[in-house]
Amino acid sequence: MSNPQEELLPPSAEDDELTLPRASINKIIKELVPTVRVANESRELILNCCSEFIHLISSEANEVCNMRNKKTINAEHVLEALERLGFHDYKQEAEAVLHDCKEVAAKRRRQSTRLENLGIPEEELLRQQQELFAKAREEQAREEQQQWMSMQAAAMVQRPPLADGSVASKPSEDDDDDDDDDY
């Protein structure tokens, strides 16, 4: 018989693939007992127990599957395995979870077929989408044009008009130099 301390040791590299992710186990522990600090040794024991439980259920479900000459283990095989191993309470909870999963899957299927049930061909939907994109581009160009025109108008307000109606330009430095020579 093996030493109980050896069973608590982390699994070897080859067994590491057969365990649940430690982060998942830690999250479950934290959710179930948020105010309790759980030692690493206890976490490792829980991880090993979970892995052993899954292995036990999987093996029994495989036997049920083989007895029925099936090649794929399905939910009914797992539920029967729970029953055969004496986990009647787990079976009832597993059935409830299975029912919920089936409802979610059916809802997902309904949502994915919603586009198909519109009755509009995909080509028409694509054409409508392209039209909407073109309208959005036109609207954006119009807004940018209006913004540009308002900036131009603001710049015109800052420059005073000349007598002939044209707008005075900012004097250049060369013009200033010419004026100094006249004195």
Curated annotation (Swiss-Prot):
It is found in: Nucleus. Its main location: nucleus. Disulfide bonds: none annotated. Residues 92-183 are annotated as: Repression of TATA-containing promoters. GO terms for molecular function: core promoter sequence-specific DNA binding; DNA-binding transcription factor binding; protein heterodimerization activity; RNA polymerase II general transcription initiation factor activity; TBP-class protein binding. Residues 155-183 are annotated as: Disordered. It comes from the Eukaryota. GO terms for cellular component: ATAC complex; negative cofactor 2 complex; nucleus. One of its GO terms (biological process) is negative regulation of transcription by RNA polymerase II. Coiled coil: none annotated. Residues 173-183 have a biased composition (Acidic residues). Keywords: Activator, DNA-binding, Nucleus, Repressor, Transcription, Transcription regulation. InterPro entries: CBFA_NFYB_domain, Histone-fold, Ncb2. Residues 19-82 form the Histone-fold domain. Pfam families: CBFD_NFYB_HMF. Component of the Ada2a-containing (ATAC) complex composed of at least Ada2a, Atac1, Hcf, Ada3, Gcn5, Mocs2B, Charac-14, Atac3, Atac2, NC2beta and wds. Homodimer. Interacts with NC2-alpha/Drap1 to form the dNC2 complex. Belongs to the NC2 beta/DR1 family. Bifunctional basic transcription factor. Activates transcription of DPE (Downstream Promoter Element) containing promoters while repressing transcription of promoters which contain TATA elements. Together with Chrac-14, promotes nucleosome sliding of ATP-dependent nucleosome remodeling complexes. This is Protein Dr1. It comes from Drosophila melanogaster. The gene is NC2beta.
